[in-house]
Amino acid sequence: MKTSGTVYVFLLLLAFGIFTDISSACSEQMDDEDSYEVEKRGNACIEVCLQHTGNPAECDKACDK
């Protein structure tokens, strides 16, 4: 009986460890996606600005680069 209790506790700790690893990996991936979206939007701003003005320095200022 004591062995089954020990196995049960071990399985609970293992499940908790796996859950925390997965949740931390997901949060890191979300941070990477957020930074990519900001970079993507910034590049789109510069592209549109360059199409209208043709002045890279002005576009850098306008797009906060």
From Swiss-Prot:
Residues spanning the signal sequence: 1-26
Entry annotated with the keyword Repeat: no
Propeptide section residues: 27-39
Positions of disulphide bridges: 45-63, 49-59
CC per GO annotation: extracellular region
Domain-related comment: Has the structural arrangement of two alpha-helices stabilized by disulfide bonds (CSalpha/alpha 2(S-S)).
Name the UniProt record assigns to this protein: Potassium channel toxin kappa-KTx 2.7
Known tissue expression: Expressed by the venom gland.
Family: Belongs to the short scorpion toxin superfamily. Potassium channel inhibitor kappa-KTx family. Kappa-KTx 2 subfamily.
Keywords: Cleavage on pair of basic residues, Disulfide bond, Ion channel impairing toxin, Neurotoxin, Potassium channel impairing toxin, Secreted, Signal, Toxin, Voltage-gated potassium channel impairing toxin
Functional description taken from the UniProt entry: Weakly inhibits the Kv7.1/KCNQ1 channel (10 uM of the toxin inhibits currents by 17.8%).
Compartment(s) of residence: Secreted
Transmembrane segment boundaries: none
A molecular function (GO) term: potassium channel regulator activity
